[in-house]
């Protein structure tokens, strides 16, 4: 519909132009032949004939403007009745021209530009550069047409002059509107830059501190010279992170390393007016400070160096792991076994498994217990006792040693004497502690965890010994003790908690060399009960 309306408008304009040209040619022919025009002798009649012709052209132009506005606005309105009657009369007179124009649409499209330029030179109201003119321009054109219609007879030049004055403004407005799509893409790019600049602007205008601008300028120039320019401002809690205040707060506390070691991030968070409910606020602030401010701190203040920073970070990580590991190390308790109490740790300077009467001799060791004040107490094996464990055996050994140390500590504290005064324990006490440890801890754990423990120890009498513990099931433990090259083997069975003494059934096999010789002996049959570690082989 729009294209059809435009084509009809152009056709009407072309007809009006052809009529004007025909009239001009006719006047030229009359003047060249020397004949007087009909209007020469009768000026009044000539003016009367000219006025209807001018009004006719003006009406045609008004109808063209109305049709163009309807086409641009997407409306299918009909022109005025006078224009439609004139259009019908002209269409009947020029049917042949319409047929030719319909047949040659391509030629008409080519002549469109030239015809419009000619019409603009004659009648400035016909400014039809495009179909998509807005309502404001159409309103201005309508006002111009109405004023031209109200002028009356013999006054065609004033509206033409007024339209010439209005045309440059309309053309400039059209150029501005035409320039809007062209300048749209640069505006989008500027919008992205504006957001980036707006972040910097917010950072500079967070408060009225006069030192803020000086600090930020110095910081950005330093990072630029360093080769790591600040390309973006960090955002935290949906707001720009105040780098200036963060630097001031951290340096007041002694620098980044001091803040990490003393765990002062909560105070830093409050100083920045950030919500304390932020997840990992300390980690976020630390990483942002390391990225944007720590090189500047090292350069300007020299409060620490990167090596100290790395050491502080590693120490913080180790401390966190130690806290989580220490609370769960000695809390294992299988179902059906008595649960062990978690208590302060002990530092043991010497610990050995002994106290059993083997071959008429007693293996005893000195055990020193030291209680440290106001400090966590850790359990440590002496360096002269190498321990070889596999899989979960280390955990079992630590549990056994922990149970023994706890029992010793309870007895010493109940007696009311300081731990430093009792330096040694008797062989019977050690035997009872070892038996209880094996039955209540190792046996309970090895019911689910296979283990093979070998403890080599060298006593003061230069006697080499080794202990091997192997689980045979849920109710027994195979035990092998090596002393001075002699191997003692046996089986330890589970005993109810009510009995005071343990029961051991098994056999011992001695293989060794004494004074360059070797001897093998077989102990009592397995069915003969005996006390633990009391199978004495015959020489």
Swiss-Prot record:
Signal peptide: none annotated. The keyword Nucleus applies. GO terms for molecular function: DNA binding. Residues 404-499 form the REKLES domain. Residues 161-173, 497-512 have a biased composition (Polar residues). Residues 55-73, 519-539 have a biased composition (Low complexity). Residues 495-502 are annotated as: Important for cytoplasmic localization. GO terms for biological process: regulation of transcription by RNA polymerase II. InterPro entries: ARI3A/B/C (IPR045147), ARID_dom (IPR001606), ARID_dom_sf (IPR036431), REKLES_domain (IPR023334). The keyword Cytoplasm applies. Residues 450-471 are annotated as: Homodimerization. SUPFAM superfamilies: ARID-like. Keywords: Cytoplasm, Developmental protein, DNA-binding, Nucleus, Transcription, Transcription regulation. Residues 209-301 form the ARID domain. Residues 84-100, 113-141 have a biased composition (Acidic residues). Transcription factor required for smad1 and smad2-mediated responses to TGFbeta during mesoderm induction. This is AT-rich interactive domain-containing protein 3A. It comes from Xenopus laevis (African clawed frog). The lineage of its organism: Eukaryota, Metazoa, Chordata, Craniata, Vertebrata.
């Amino acid at each position: 519909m729009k294209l059809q309306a435009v084509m009809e408008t152009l056709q009407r304009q072309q007809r009006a132009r052809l009529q004007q040209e025909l009239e001009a040619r006719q006047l030229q022919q009359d003047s060249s032949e020397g004949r007087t025009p009909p209007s020469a002798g009768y000026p009044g009649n000539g003016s009367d004939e000219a006025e209807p012709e001018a009004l006719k052209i003006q009406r045609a132009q008004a109808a063209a403007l109305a049709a163009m506005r309807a086409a641009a606005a997407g409306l299918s309105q009909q022109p005025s009745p006078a224009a439609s009657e004139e259009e019908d009369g002209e269409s009947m007179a020029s049917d042949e021209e319409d047929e030719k124009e319909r047949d040659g649409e391509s030629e008409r499209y080519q002549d469109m530009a030239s015809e419009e330029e000619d019409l603009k030179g004659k009648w400035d109201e016909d400014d039809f550069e495009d179909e998509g003119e807005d309502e404001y321009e159409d309103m201005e054109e309508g006002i111009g047409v109405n004023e031209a219609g109200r002028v009356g007879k013999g006054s065609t030049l004033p509206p033409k002059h007024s339209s010439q004055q209005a045309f440059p403004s309309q053309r400039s407005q059209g150029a501005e509107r035409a320039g809007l799509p062209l300048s749209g893409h640069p505006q989008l790019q500027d919008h992205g830059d504006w957001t980036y600049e707006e972040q910097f602007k917010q950072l500079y205008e967070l408060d009225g501190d006069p030192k803020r601008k000086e600090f930020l300028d110095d910081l950005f120039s330093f990072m630029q010279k360093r080769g790591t320019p600040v390309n973006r401002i960090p955002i935290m809690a949906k707001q720009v992170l105040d780098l200036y205040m963060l630097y001031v707060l951290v340096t007041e506390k002694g620098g980044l390393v001091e803040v990490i070691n003393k765990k002062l991030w909560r105070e830093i968070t409050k100083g920045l007016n950030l919500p304390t409910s932020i997840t990992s606020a300390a980690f976020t602030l630390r990483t942002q400070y390391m990225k944007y401010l720590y090189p500047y701190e090292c350069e300007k203040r020299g409060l620490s160096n990167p090596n100290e920073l790395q050491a502080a970070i590693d120490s913080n990580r180790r401390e966190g792991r130690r806290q989580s590991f220490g609370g769960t190390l000695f809390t294992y308790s299988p179902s059906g076994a008595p649960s062990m109490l978690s208590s302060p740790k002990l530092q043991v300077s010497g610990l050995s498994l002994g106290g059993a009467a083997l071959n008429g001799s007693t293996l005893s060791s000195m055990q020193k217990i030291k209680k440290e004040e106001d400090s966590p107490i850790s359990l440590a094996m002496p360096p002269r006792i190498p321990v070889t464990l596999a899989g979960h055996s280390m955990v079992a050994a630590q549990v056994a040693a922990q149970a023994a140390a706890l029992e010793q500590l309870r007895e010493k504290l109940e007696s009311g004497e300081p731990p430093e005064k009792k330096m040694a324990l008797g062989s019977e006490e050690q035997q009872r502690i070892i038996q209880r440890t094996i039955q209540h801890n190792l046996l309970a754990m090895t019911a689910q965890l296979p283990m093979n423990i070998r403890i080599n120890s060298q006593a003061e009498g230069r006697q080499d010994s080794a202990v091997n513990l192997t689980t045979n099931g849920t109710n027994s433990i195979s035990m092998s003790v090596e002393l001075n090259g002699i191997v003692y083997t046996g089986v330890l069975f589970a005993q109810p908690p009510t009995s005071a003494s343990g029961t051991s059934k098994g056999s011992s096999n001695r293989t060794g060399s004494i004074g360059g010789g070797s001897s093998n002996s077989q102990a009592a049959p397995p069915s003969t009960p005996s006390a633990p570690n009391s199978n004495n082989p015959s020489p």
